[in-house]
Regions:
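Conserved donor-binding loop and adjoining core beta-sheet/short helix segment
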Residues: 33-53
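Conserved N-terminal entry element of GNAT/NAT acetyltransferase domains
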Residues: 1-19
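Conserved acetyl-CoA-binding loop-helix of GNAT-fold acetyltransferases
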Residues: 57, 63-76
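Conserved GNAT acetyl-CoA-binding A-motif
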Residues: 49, 76-91
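C-terminal "cap" of GNAT-fold acetyltransferases
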Residues: 108-121
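Conserved active-site tyrosine of GNAT-family acetyltransferases
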Residues: 96, 100
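Conserved acetyl-CoA binding element of GNAT-fold acetyltransferases
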Residues: 48-59, 84
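Conserved beta-hairpin
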Residues: 16-20, 24-39
Length: 121
């Protein structure tokens, strides 16, 4: 029998994002609730770009804003975040569409690279 994950009432205030740096070019942000991994976002630096490699959120936490929280944390930490938009899944594209409404962005049409920038204070 699979044990269902139960959320505490104030779960959003208990979330922690930890950074793991694997090299100068590769890092990961992990979203945790207490000791449970909720999701992660992996980034690879290529030249001036910080490309999202993988984003994953456990099924029980999908649709609750956890993925968006990881994207926004990465943007705020790195200053910008990029994707090859046409290679992104339809779910990821929906997140990117929400991000471009909130952040400055550039779209390099011929390369298919979409970059979202942290707003200047």
């Amino acid at each position: 029998m699979i044990k269902k994950f139960k959320l505490p009432k104030n779960w959003r205030t208990q979330l922690i994002i930890e950074e793991y740096r694997y090299s100068r070019k590769e890092l990961e942000y992990r979203l945790k609730l207490k000791d449970k991994d909720i999701g992660y976002l992996s980034v690879l630096k290529k030249g001036k770009y910080f490309f999202v490699k993988v984003v994953s959120v456990i099924p029980e936490m999908r649709g609750k804003g956890c993925g968006s929280m990881l994207y926004e944390h990465a943007i705020n930490q790195l200053g910008r975040l990029s994707t090859n938009y046409h290679a992104a899944s339809s779910l990821a594209q929906r997140v990117w569409i929400r991000l471009i409404k909130k952040y400055e962005h550039t779209d390099e049409f011929f390369t298919g690279i979409l970059t979202v920038y942290k707003k200047k204070d």
